[in-house]
């Protein structure tokens, strides 16, 4: 199904290809791997 683009919160959805879920403050967002 869906994947999260760069800058999108990834706590309830996985990141798109070549992105990784990283913690930023109290959120987790997708950033370049």
Swiss-Prot record:
Keywords, in A-Z order: Disulfide bond, Knottin, Secreted
**As annotated in Swiss-Prot or TrEMBL, what is the tissue specificity of this protein?**
Expressed by the venom gland.
Cellular location of this protein?
Answer: Secreted
The keyword Secreted is assigned to this record:
yes
Any one cellular-component term (Gene Ontology): extracellular region
List cystine links: 3-16, 10-21, 15-30
Family label:
Belongs to the neurotoxin 33 family.
What function does this protein fulfil? Non-toxic to mice.
Provide the domain comment.
The presence of a 'disulfide through disulfide knot' structurally defines this protein as a knottin.
| Name the record gives this protein | U23-ctenitoxin-Pn1a
């Amino acid at each position: 199904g869906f994947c999260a683009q760069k800058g999108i919160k990834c706590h309830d959805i996985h990141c798109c290809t070549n992105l990784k879920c990283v913690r930023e403050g109290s959120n987790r967002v997708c950033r370049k791997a």
